[in-house]
Amino acid sequence: MSVANHSLLYDNALLPFYKKIQAYIPRCITPNMITILNLLIVLGVFISKQFYNPLVLMVTIFIYSFLDNLDGIYARESKQTSNLGEILDHGNDIFIGILIFYMLFMLLNGELDTYTKIILILIFFNTILFLLKDIYFHKIDYGFKYFSLDEALILLIFVPLLKYFNTTKQKNKLFTNGLCIILILFSIYNSIDFIPQINTLDYDSKPIIITNLITTIVIMLVSYYLLAKKYSVIWPAFIYYLFVVYLIINKQNNKNKNKLLIN
């Protein structure tokens, strides 16, 4: 799967690191083997119920993130890309995403109130919607240069880490709620950011994208309402929306400048 939006962290730190690592992989090992290995590791932790150990879950999320990036880079660098590889990669993203969400949810279940549980479930469905959209277009268009999927996974690693170091429930709740706010705003940005691209899509693609956007926006508005009702934090939304509008206008201006340069 190709990625449309990479972050500064990925481009400047992670990508060079992965390229060095893939050079040491024997060419008799295929990218699909790495993808399947990734699935088996996560599935093994899930079946054995070792995810109740915060350290095991933290390492599992790290391994998933590492191998998920590595198999794609290795496939491109070794020129072993294939349709089967894309299908396996897409399937892994959704299936492993479901497993990781479930394992995190079960690990923190005793410390989450009803509002937070609902918000996390809504964020999860929003992520699945974006993954399905990405499968249709054969690329990930999620995030921007300051925050992408890699940063989101790094944040998720810290959730079981807090549990492992036996921090107080209050601190765990503060971090989890903060993570909820970040993911909600991140998802709203992705929804709004894709709106200007609708006019460039072909006729068959528009119903899929419009349905995705409407569903996503509804999910995120409900999430933000629940969070605002719980913490009375409606006022940051206005500041955030201004920031989102600025990002979209700036991105559109850059695209227009690039078109002028090309012409």
What residue spans do the PLM features occupy?
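Membrane-embedded alpha-helical segments that form the functional core of polytopic membrane enzymes
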Residues: 35-84, 99-104, 116-127, 180-183
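Alpha-helical transmembrane segments that form the membrane-embedded catalytic/substrate-binding core
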Residues: 85-101, 148-155
